[in-house]
Amino acid sequence: MNYIDKDIKDFDDYIEFTTFNKFNVKILFTKKHYGSIPEKSREEVAEDFSLKDKIMVSSHQTHSDNVVLVGENPDETYFENTDGILTSNKNVAILTKYADCLPIFIYDEESKIFGAVHSGWKGTYQEIVKRAIEKINPKSLSTINILFGIGISSENYKVGVEFYEQFRNKFPKEIVEKTFSIKDGDFYFNNQLFNYYLLKDYGVKEDKIFLNNRCTFKENFHSFRRDKEFSGRNGAIMFMEV
């Protein structure tokens, strides 16, 4: 497995994932110190990160498996009921929001399509990352690169037996066994690892899937599990440098 913790740069207000820099794709993820993304306008975010020359595209996220592909001349820059945004438009910056759910960043070397999906347990159960890959429709899965952002770690993600049974009844036994653990009679779910094995099962190359050991719950990020109704949202910003 490819863990890329050493490729993550920490700043006061955000972190930067540098793994996709070789594709000229930048990925930023805001910290709690920056504030809550829904309380800021897209114009404010663009100005704060020197992206005023970009078209900032975002959505109302509903834990769906809906993914949109934004074209060269986008008529819409805000999408309802959407949890994945893709584009090959170098003028677009994609803004998605999280508070423990897993950000999954995608880049296809052939089509130059890049994007982000919001995959909490509902998105994972609905296989939103597969919906995104299907939307890209690559000639070969060998050109697909996947980078997991920072979500909640399994040690802080306690779930009920009904949750476990729901996944066990739908997915291959070997994937479920590798991604659920039991401690003192409680179940814990590894969302990142589950998506890793799903992607391998789809046919994405293992050496093009990148993981990390970070955790929103333990670190200076917004976390719904930790802060409950007082939790804000972290923002993931993905764009192509030109």
Give, region by region, the residue ranges found by the protein language model:
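Active-site microenvironment for binding and transforming phosphate-containing groups
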Residues: 1-242
